[in-house]
Every structure is written in C-alpha cells, then in structure tokens.
Amino acid sequence: MMRTISEEALQRLREAFPVGCRVELDYMNDAYNRKLTSGSKGTVKHIDDIGTIFVSWDCGSGLGVAYGEDSCHRIDE
C-alpha cells in the first residue's frame, strides 16, 4: 500500500537524511530484492517528493527505501 507523506514530514525526512549521509538498512519489504539485507550500508543520493530515500548501496544496488514500508537509519562513518 502506498503511503502519503505530508510536506512537514518530508522536510523532516530531508533534514534527517541529507544527501551524502551514510545509512544502514533495517528492513525492506521487497520480495524480489536479492542484494539487500538488514545491515546493508549505503550513501543517500536524494529523497523524492513521496519520501523515497534513494541510496547508492555499497553492494551495487540502487533500490530506494520506501516511506512507510521500508526502514533505514543514519550512521556515522
């Protein structure tokens, strides 16, 4: 189910995950994903207008973290 994000929540998300920050995947709800697992790390490339966090994952994947479906957290590296 696609979830919507308010302008305020989108702004908070963009502040919490600025371009270039490092993230670690907690959970991804994608039955076809074979590369990413919990603990995968990557670099934020951008966040679109529906709140998807696009990441350049260290494993080579470019899958986005979908707002309200998937989960990641910022890490300091």
How should these model regions be labeled?
Residues 2-14, 18-77:
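Basic/aromatic-rich interaction segments and small domains that mediate binding to polyanionic partners
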